[in-house]
């Protein structure tokens, strides 16, 4: 027979108004600055699986998002840039942890914040060539998180938030070549900085980079692609957690493949 070991409300209700305020100023035809403030909200809910030591219900998450930025163009529009600074102030942030035998359990942290900046640029120096670069920096931590009477994570970094992210891509497109409408060559390098997998910050993933390559040939409505992902076969973890033992999921290894695309509309 089943034995009830815990009781909780079998229904709940959440509601929240989420305002957003934005101001922008067009400095010229190719330069714009802006600032925004927005209220964020994520409804609470129930953990599908729970024990007497894990709360079946979790509370809503609230945050205020502050951002200032600019979008600028130079060299007659051939160089497009964007930059932004942000700050996020969280209350009762929902934090997901993996518990063996139960799966993912959501708890609420008391107070946390995230601050950083993002930069991006797209440059077209000549016909057919496009260069892209993106960089992001995030410093996210628990300002107050007492998971239990004896377990405190205050001051730790937020799990699953990389400190740095970056991406570089180069694309060259040939038009009307070898009987094709266009032939596109692309190389993209993405980098992910150090990331902590757990709230206690004892399990972490060092920085790594992935290289993807692609060739695409287009004729009429048909496009044939030949591609490779993680071309250098970089070893990294896509997810990890620790209990009595270490559990980790490896990232996808080197892959090569081909695709055929058909566009319905000319």
PLM region descriptions:
Residues 1-28:
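Signature of Gram-negative outer-membrane beta-barrel scaffolds
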Residues 15, 24-26, 60, 72-74, ...:
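Residue-level signature of outer-membrane beta-barrel architecture
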Residues 28-30, 75-78, 128, 175-183, ...:
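Short loop/turn motifs that connect adjacent beta-strands in outer-membrane beta-barrel proteins
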Residues 26, 32-38, 57-115, 124, ...:
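Membrane-embedded beta-barrel scaffold of Gram-negative outer-membrane proteins
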Residues 87-89, 107-198, 259-263:
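Gram-negative outer-membrane beta-barrel transporters
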């Amino acid at each position: 027979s089943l034995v009830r070991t815990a009781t909780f409300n079998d229904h709940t209700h959440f509601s929240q108004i989420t305002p957003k305020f934005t101001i922008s100023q067009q400095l010229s035809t190719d330069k714009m600055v802006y600032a925004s403030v927005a209220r964020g909200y994520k409804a609470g809910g129930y953990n599908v699986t729970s024990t007497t030591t894990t709360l079946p219900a979790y509370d809503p998450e609230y945050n205020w998002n502050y951002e200032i930025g600019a979008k600028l163009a130079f060299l007659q529009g051939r160089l497009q840039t964007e930059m932004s600074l942000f700050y996020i102030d969280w209350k009762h942030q929902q934090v997901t942890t993996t518990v063996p035998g139960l799966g993912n359990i959501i708890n609420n942290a008391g107070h946390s914040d995230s601050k950083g900046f993002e930069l991006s640029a797209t440059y077209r120096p000549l016909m057919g060539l496009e260069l892209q670069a993106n960089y992001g920096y995030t410093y996210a931590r628990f300002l107050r998180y007492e998971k239990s009477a004896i377990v405190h994570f205050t001051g730790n970094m937020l799990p699953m938030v990389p400190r740095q992210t970056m991406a570089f891509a180069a694309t060259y497109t040939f038009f009307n070549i070898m009987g094709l409408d266009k032939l596109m060559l692309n190389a993209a390098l993405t980098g992910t900085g150090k990331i902590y997998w757990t709230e206690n910050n004892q399990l972490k993933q060092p920085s790594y980079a992935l290289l993807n390559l692609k060739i695409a040939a287009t004729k009429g409505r048909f496009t044939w692609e030949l591609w490779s992902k993680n071309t250098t076969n970089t070893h990294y973890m896509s997810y990890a957690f620790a209990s009595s033992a270490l559990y980790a999921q490896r990232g996808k290894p080197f892959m090569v493949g081909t695709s055929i695309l058909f566009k319905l509309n000319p």
